[in-house]
Amino acid sequence: MAKNIGKITQIISAVVDVKFTNNGELPEILNALECYNDKQRIVLEVAQHIGDDTVRCIAMDSTEGLVRGVEVIDTGSPIRIPVGTETLGRIMNVVGEPIDGKGDIKSSNISSIYKPAPDFTNQSTERNILVTGIKVIDLLAPYTKGGKIGLFGGAGVGKTVLIMELINNVAKAHGGYTVFAGVGERTREGNDLYHEMIDSGVINLAEPEKSKVALVYGQMNEPPGARARVALSGLTIAESFRDMNEGQDVLFFVDNIFRFTQAGSEVSALLGRIPSAVGYQPTLATDMGELQERITSTKYGSITSVQAIYVPADDLTDPAPATSFAHLDATTVLSRQIAELGIYPAVDPLDSNSQVLDPMIVGEEHYSVARQVQQVLQTYKSLQDIIAILGMDELSEEDKLTVVRARKIQRFLSQPFHVAEVFTGAEGKFVNLADTIAGFKGLVEGKYDDLPEAAFYMVGTIDEAIEKAQTLK
């Protein structure tokens, strides 16, 4: 079959116009076109047909040095990337090229980054909890298999460490794989994450097939086309893991979903579309829906996504975060105030929530214990002003008891992480859900009122707290 060849007629930043004159056939919308800029392959994605013989494209790489008249070849399909276990332990860019300097990714499976969401008949409607082994999450804001979790956190509160522990625990407990999509990521942060994963054993350089994670990066310095599509590239790899070997549980991280929206806004402006509210693209809801609807469980496996979400100017009504919220099943909020107390993971037990914290799904005991824990913590929070002004002595005996229990609960919500062993020297703990519920049930019922506060800090199960109390005496 003869190749469909065109020539570049106009270049405006990341937008490139290509004219096809040979047989009058235009490439389809979303097709990938290839050209070479001084031996460097550049992929262009068809965005618009602007006449009988010209297409307008978005470049997936820098157009610096590209000139008019350069030959462009229609590949005949959308962007295709390598998928499967060969991607484990590797970093690739939006078009599937390795960027870790470790040679080509030799995968026999190549897949388009555009796929329809699974059919309704193939989707699973069961709601099962994904046990993470992290007490505060499993008890108060449980994740669901195939669910979407929003992770809100500023700089330095432990977001990366929490992400790495989730990667480690889910892979260990479920034998599942993880995909990390760095969307508009700072190159330094992406580099740090990669090296931390190597140090903590999540990536095995000697035997890459034993790694638990595949990484796809579209850094902050890259053109908007790459940043707008890199989440789809990551999701395509996650889907391949979900559907292989009779199904897998896959964890899919996106950092940051706001930058995916922001890149879409830039692309929209470059294509001359009329902006909608606050300057965002008119297709904001559609773009978000196309990504989010593919993140789902089938009868064979699940994709559970954890999405870091930046909230511009702390305005939750901004169209970008507001559109994301509509798709989330749970929110995990990391708090600087809790991090300042030295309690890690610094998850806010009162701000974080989950749709699956429902007696019909988690069971009556789990639901009851979680609500009692939150009630004790909420009472303690409302008493803090009184304590700050008048001191503990002015409280009633009942309130004093509540404060003592709340402080123990606060400390028991902390736990040592496997991936932080290098820094803390403390052995990481994976806590089963039954042990988590039993421990907090005993705390709210007053069974451990005689144990010192320090015994509950940075331990796994309640038995470890009892053992620690013996050593403190």
UniProtKB/Swiss-Prot annotation:
Its main location: membrane. The keyword NADP does not apply. Coiled coil: none annotated. Keywords: ATP synthesis, ATP-binding, Cell inner membrane, Cell membrane, CF(1), Hydrogen ion transport, Ion transport, Membrane, Nucleotide-binding, Translocase, Transport. SMART domains: AAA. InterPro entries: AAA+_ATPase, ATP-synt_VA_C, ATP_synth_F1_bsu, ATPase_a/bsu_AS, ATPase_alpha/beta_chains, ATPase_F1/V1/A1_a/bsu_N, ATPase_F1/V1/A1_a/bsu_N_sf, ATPase_F1/V1/A1_a/bsu_nucl-bd. It is an enzyme of class 7 (translocase). GO terms for cellular component: plasma membrane; proton-transporting ATP synthase complex. Its EC number is 7.1.2.2. It holds the Pfam family ATP-synt_VA_C. GO terms for molecular function: ATP binding; ATP hydrolysis activity; proton-transporting ATP synthase activity, rotational mechanism. ATP binds at G153, G154, A155, G156, V157, G158, K159, T160. The keyword Calcium does not apply. It is found in: Cell inner membrane. It comes from the Bacteria. It catalyses: ATP + H2O + 4 H(+)(in) = ADP + phosphate + 5 H(+)(out). It is a peripheral membrane protein. F-type ATPases have 2 components, CF(1) - the catalytic core - and CF(0) - the membrane proton channel. CF(1) has five subunits: alpha(3), beta(3), gamma(1), delta(1), epsilon(1). CF(0) has three main subunits: a(1), b(2) and c(9-12). The alpha and beta chains form an alternating ring which encloses part of the gamma chain. CF(1) is attached to CF(0) by a central stalk formed by the gamma and epsilon chains, while a peripheral stalk is formed by the delta and b chains. Produces ATP from ADP in the presence of a proton gradient across the membrane. The catalytic sites are hosted primarily by the beta subunits. Belongs to the ATPase alpha/beta chains family. NCBIfam families: atpD. This is ATP synthase subunit beta. It comes from Rickettsia massiliae (strain Mtu5).
